[in-house]
Amino acid sequence: MFLTGWALLPAIALVVWIYRQDKVEKEPGGLLRKIFLFGVLSVIPAMILEIILDEVFLVFVDADTLCYVILDNFIGVALIEELCKMQAAKWAAWKHPAFNYKFDAIVYCVTSALGFAAIENVLYCLEGDIGTAVTRALLSVPSHAIDGVIMGYFFGVAKEAELAGNKKRRKRYLKLSVFMPMIEHGIYDSALSLDADWIFVFFFLFVIVVDVWAYKFVKKQSGQDRELSA
């Protein structure tokens, strides 16, 4: 029970933080709870697809090769998880009347990502200990939130394109809302999967740079928030 609480706390704290950054018009609590729940549920299809893809990759490449590490982390994990998190946010919020400001998209995608991260964290911590909970609270959960920030920017552009009747631009930016966070996610997971001293140095530098960038980007987007227009 104690570890479960530790596992949930960082995700909930970050949801509250991103909610407070929405300065113009707060999002309905019911909508955010729905998005969070959809994010939690998106773990199910993600796990199934990850298992299937892993088996497919192992048919063609050995598990101890760099090729497998790249394929598994970028496609078998990052692409699948970001797609599931984006769909969770889209199903819950895309047609909702509250989705009327650009920063709303970041709030929605971060909330979905943290729903996913929360249940993933619980599963990992049930198999680990307090050290696992602390490490994931400092690294893995914020990384999911950052993926949500990246996703949310492109998600918002796609929504505005739809309002303008530009289907081609909408489609392109919805794809980017998955592809761009996939890059960050894939680099993060790949660095953790490789066994080399310089990789660990790179990983921690990468985490620091991305964390600082994401914080500044959220502040900037919050300060420049505006109503979505056709």
Q: Residue ranges of each PLM-predicted region?
A:
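Hydrophobic alpha-helical segments at protein termini of multi-pass membrane proteins
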Residues: M1-A230
